[in-house]
Amino acid sequence: QAALDPVASEKPVVVSPNPFYQIYEGATLLGNGEIVYANTTAPRFLPDWHSVPAEKWTRCKIVFVCSPDNPTGSVLTRDDWAQLFELQDKYGFIIASDECYAEIYFDGQKPIGCLQAAAELGRTFDNIIMFTSLSKRSNVPGLRSGFVAGDVELLKNFLLYRTYHGSAMGIPVQHASIAAWNDEQHVIENR
């Protein structure tokens, strides 16, 4: 919502993987955007970005990515990120990378996130925002504690948005969050 222009003459497009986490669609609709789905395809069940018509890409403001994905479990590789970055270079959209499941993997190989992929490919973090939380990492979905990182200008707008639309984190939640972020053993055991 913070990145969409609700008074634009044309509805901004937001591209979402399908299936998807419902908040992507809800935030798009609340921001007066048009949701367009990139269906996942076998065998890897990654979003098929090429199925999105060029006319939609030209109006695209945000692409939601979830890796590891909920609910498919699919994981983007550096090459997959590179392909998405090529589309971003062509159309100028923001990548909103949901990495709440990044700590849940089974083969000992930590998935590469959006910011890491950008850095390894020699890119800046322009028009990239990544978010994660303790919900999945630490099995505390009600705690509502996480963070965002990425493009400084996007983060400034996000901070302004959160200041007026968010809620403050209580001191007990802050202490519990610090303890959870500082403990890796429970994450390893959960994995």
Q: How would you describe each model-predicted region?
A:
Residues 127-191:
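PLP-dependent aminotransferase class I/II
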Residues 14-15, 28, 63, 70, ...:
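Generic structural signal for small/hydrophobic residues in well-ordered secondary structure
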Residues 1-13:
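Phosphate-binding glycine-rich loop
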Residues 18, 37-41:
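Short beta->alpha connector loops at strand-helix junctions that form conserved
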Residues 40-110:
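Active-site phosphate-binding strand-loop segment of PLP-dependent enzymes
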Residues 4-7, 24-28:
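Short hydrophobic alpha-helical segments of the AMP-binding
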Residues 24, 84, 114-118:
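Aromatic/hydrophobic pocket-lining residues that form π-stacking "cages" and hydrophobic walls in ligand
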Residues 12, 33, 88-94, 125-126:
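A short helix->loop->beta-strand "cap" motif at the edges of active sites that frequently abuts
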